[in-house]
Curated annotation (Swiss-Prot):
PROSITE patterns: EPHRIN_RBD_1, EPHRIN_RBD_2. Disulfide bonds join 51-92, 80-140. Belongs to the ephrin family. Residues 183-205 form a propeptide. Residues 1-17 form the signal peptide. It comes from Rattus norvegicus. It is a lipid-anchor; GPI-anchor. Its main location: membrane. Undergoes proteolysis by a metalloprotease to give rise to a soluble monomeric form. N-Glycosylation is required for binding to EPHA2 receptor and inducing its internalization. This is Ephrin-A1.
Amino acid sequence: MEFLWAPLLGLCCSLAAADRHIVFWNSSNPKFREEDYTVHVQLNDYLDIICPHYEDDSVADAAMERYTLYMVEHQEYVTCEPQSKDQVRWKCNQPSAKHGPEKLSEKFQRFTPFTLGKEFKEGHSYYYISKPIYHQETQCLKLKVTVNGKITHSPHAHANPQEKRLQADDPEVQVLHSIGHSAAPRLFPLVWAVLLLPLLLLQTQ
């Protein structure tokens, strides 16, 4: 039964470690005015796209922002022009939905069991652009997502210089000697005596 807990524990740990990165996809988001709006993620993180939403009637329906989002290659990202309808990723087309703004999510996973799912690799960048539906839009909304590699730190990279001055014979310093020695616990002389006593008694009989 205990073997069943291992995959469940691993799944829980991976879910707990995943981050969610939120992007509000509308023309009023100042981040889209940056030249290279980039979000950095790790594998198994999520990207949440929040679509435009209007809670009152102050904006005419024809003026409400609606977008078709595409996942494209770098050159199409630069020109902000998709090449195929097959590149359509999502549609933000319910700006006045009663349940609130639409949320579209992408999981950056190495493998996916779904036919329409996307697979991502560490060290690669992925590109999203949008084209307006109905309304006129002069600004190109586009996003670059980079999947970072695993962060590794050298054990001595951030060592405290003060720690290097500590001497091994300092009574307040506990030094663990692990290099060149067995990891098995050492047996004290009294323990050896207890273990050898039965052998000594057998020899005397």
